[in-house]
Amino acid sequence: MSDLPIINFINFNQNGTCISIGTSQGFKIFNCEPFGRFYQDDEGGCGIVEMLFSTSLLAVVGMGENPAMSPRRLRMLNTKRHSVICEVTFPTTILSIKMNKTRLAVLLQEQIYIYDISNMRLLHTIETSMNAQGLMSMSPNSENNYLVYPSPPKVINSEIKDHATTNNINIKKSDAAEDPLRKDHFAYDPSDHSHPQSTTESTSNNHNRTYSSGNNNNTNSNPNKIIKNGDVIVFNLQTLQPTMVIEAHKGEIAALKLSADGTLLATASEKGTIIRVFNVENGSKVYQFRRGTYSTKISSLSFSKDNQFLAVCSSSKTVHIFKLGEKIIDNTKPNELNSDDDMDDDLLPQFENGDDEEEVDEETLDEEATSLNSSHSNKEPIVDSSRSTVGRMIRKSSQRLSRKAAKTLGAYFPIKVSSILEPSRHFASLKISTTTNQPIKAIAAIDDPISLNTNEYPDLFDTSNQADHQNTDGLKMIPVRVLSSEGYMYKYILDPERGGDCILLEQYSLLSE
């Protein structure tokens, strides 16, 4: 096991049909169905290996073991011809690369370079704030050609001290307090960057343009200022202009993802308890989901191709799958919805005990959550017997009582308050099969529905409980593939009607020869 290479990068291609993996020895490309490796290069450590759908074009960035594999150098490769198409060197380390059929975006710590992928001509440069996590998502659809990335921190003036509560706030007597309408009390402060301004400059070289996102380096100079860094910028890759800023969360963005058609944006904050989905066209919040009670690190978000499901991978080795059937939030008033949508993160209890986090994430759907997410189905959710524990049964009973109480109280409160009490839970979940106790990173891809012959898996399916199905040989299931940072690909199946626990069908190693 000690001879196995170290994994530096792992990802699906844009439609989830292939896998690219970068290691300390080189990189590999795999086909998902049927599973198998079809390309390998062992010329040096790779930190980024991005595919363009199922084509022979690869974007590769090295780990710096030699000058040719510098982490500042982007190499565009043709795997069929085994040749280098072009190389581009950047001033700092490349953190992320995203591609579709018309655009290529290269993310550095404080810049994003946008290229025409057909000729690698530089079209635009975006100056943004520090993005050490390399967060960026590009729509695979060239018609809704969008790029999203975290907005620079927004500074909000506040005279409320940290940890202040309604029990110990004292109103300070001052001239401004006695006369709150004094002109200088609301006067414009040029040093206030609560509304970042964008500037566009034109240069004569290849018509390149630079957009500044309003980076503010003095956000911590005033201790009475509140820093809000949960906004997301939506950038149109066709017009090369930002279209809007979506106020996604109060805390720092931990993960974001555009849907395959570029119409939806999913976001998660560093707390990892609330997942939100926005309409990219108007910025309205159309879905809000509760992943769990305890804080955890969200490693990735993934939409299904038809936007019916959203997979959320966390460091607790659990993947939650939410159903996006009917909109749970009325988006007829987008401004009102987004004005205080951070309330949920503040009012929900937050914990940081990583040991308990894993137990909470293992919860199954209770009756109320099942009726919400699968209102058109009277069948019980699937329960994986291998995940049945006494603790899980106790948590399920406790959650049922809590949900009933929230439902009763919600009837007496406005919609916004009741949505905080009873946010939508996951439709299905799976637990990554691993023996390590260390947190892992994972990414999921939800495939198109397939017809599964349950007779081929007698140990996984109890056909005696499937009297509703006249033909058990053609059970409709949805494959869910999960990549782990340990170097495994797992293939689970999801029942699109019943939800519940996803069943593990296959498991492959991406490192073994």
Swiss-Prot record:
One of its GO terms (biological process) is protein transport. Keywords: Autophagy, Endosome, Membrane, Protein transport, Repeat, Transport, Vacuole, WD repeat. It is a peripheral membrane protein. Residues 167-225, 333-398 are annotated as: Disordered. Disruption phenotype: Still forms preautophagosomal structures (PAS) in proximity to the vacuolar membrane. GO terms for cellular component: endosome membrane; phagophore assembly site membrane; vacuolar membrane. Its main location: membrane. Residues 289-292 are annotated as: Necessary for proper localization to vacuole membrane. Residues 172-195 have a biased composition (Basic and acidic residues). Residues 338-369 have a biased composition (Acidic residues). Pfam families: PROPPIN (PF21032). It is found in: Preautophagosomal structure membrane; Vacuole membrane; Endosome membrane. A motif (L/FRRG motif) lies at residues 289-293. Gene3D superfamilies: YVTN repeat-like/Quinoprotein amine dehydrogenase. Residues 205-225 have a biased composition (Low complexity). WD repeats lie at residues 2-40, 248-288, 293-332. Component of the PI(3,5)P2 regulatory complex. Interacts with ATG2 and ATG9. The ATG2-ATG18 complex is essential for autophagosome formation. Kluyveromyces marxianus proteins are shorter in length and have a more ordered secondary structure than their S.cerevisiae counterparts, which might contribute to the superior thermotolerance and solubility. K.marxianus could be therefore useful as a new model organism for further elucidation of the molecular details of autophagy. Belongs to the WD repeat PROPPIN family. Component of the PI(3,5)P2 regulatory complex that regulates both the synthesis and turnover of phosphatidylinositol 3,5-bisphosphate (PtdIns(3,5)P2). Plays an important role in osmotically-induced vacuole fragmentation. Required for cytoplasm to vacuole transport (Cvt) vesicle formation, pexophagy and starvation-induced autophagy. Involved in correct ATG9 trafficking to the pre-autophagosomal structure. With ATG2, protects ATG8 from ATG4-mediated cleavage. The 377 first amino acids might form a beta-propeller domain involved in specific binding to phosphatidylinositol 3,5-bisphosphate (PIP2), leading to the association of the protein to the membrane. Association to the membrane can also occur through binding to phosphatidylinositol 3-monophosphate (PI3P). This is Autophagy-related protein 18. It comes from Kluyveromyces marxianus (strain DMKU3-1042 / BCC 29191 / NBRC 104275) (Yeast). The lineage of its organism: Eukaryota, Fungi, Dikarya, Ascomycota, Saccharomycotina. The gene is ATG18.
